[in-house]
């Protein structure tokens, strides 16, 4: 059995696991930065031309026929495709991934900060279904995304999903904050404490 992504996980489940692990779900901005892998002028994580050998997506006319040029008709094991420039696997295709951000179609308030937190839950809505509950942003596309249906296997693409929904094509990944570097003053004190000089 391969190392498959965890699926059938609602947002609340993913968030609970992240808290337990001492990590968190990425913001939409963090996710997109990681997905681009240092390449900010390309359409896909791997370049500007679509290639079925780069991500687990639907090849053919959805939902009638999948040519499976990538070798998979459903979820693939993690690492079945080449990593991006940061060494991250499956940032597009395979399964959608939850982000910490609430969905708002116009991304209001996100354009002026480096790591925007997105909109508030109160402002989150789907203009086509304003009566529905607030939605979270999902990123990356999945093995069900096809050119004729859902070509969202691009870092900049986004979709919304009800927070209480877990499906066979939505998973998550976690982010951990870098540990603070020891400052020179602290290193000097530590050296003194273990027999270092006081120079």
Predicted regions mapped to residue ranges:
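Short coil/turn motifs at beta-sheet boundaries
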Residues: 131, 165-167
């Amino acid at each position: 059995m391969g190392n498959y992504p965890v699926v059938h996980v609602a947002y609340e489940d993913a968030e609970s696991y992240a808290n337990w692990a001492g990590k968190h779900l990425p913001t939409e901005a963090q996710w997109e930065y990681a997905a681009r892998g240092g390449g900010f002028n390309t359409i896909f994580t791997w370049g500007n031309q679509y290639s079925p050998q780069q991500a687990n997506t639907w090849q053919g006319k959805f939902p009638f026929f999948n040519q499976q040029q990538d070798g998979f008709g459903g979820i693939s094991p993690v690492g079945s495709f080449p990593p991006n420039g940061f060494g991250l696997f499956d940032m597009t295709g395979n399964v959608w991934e939850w982000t910490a951000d609430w969905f708002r179609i116009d991304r209001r308030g996100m354009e002026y900060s480096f790591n925007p937190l997105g909109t508030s839950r109160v402002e989150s809505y789907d203009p086509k279904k304003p009566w529905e509950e607030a939605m979270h942003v999902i990123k990356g596309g999945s093995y069900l995304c096809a050119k004729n249906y859902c070509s969202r296997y691009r870092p900049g693409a986004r979709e919304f999903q009800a927070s209480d929904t877990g499906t066979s094509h939505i998973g998550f990944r976690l982010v951990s904050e870098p540990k603070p570097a020891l400052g020179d003053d602290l290193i000097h004190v530590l050296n003194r404490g273990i027999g270092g000089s006081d120079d």
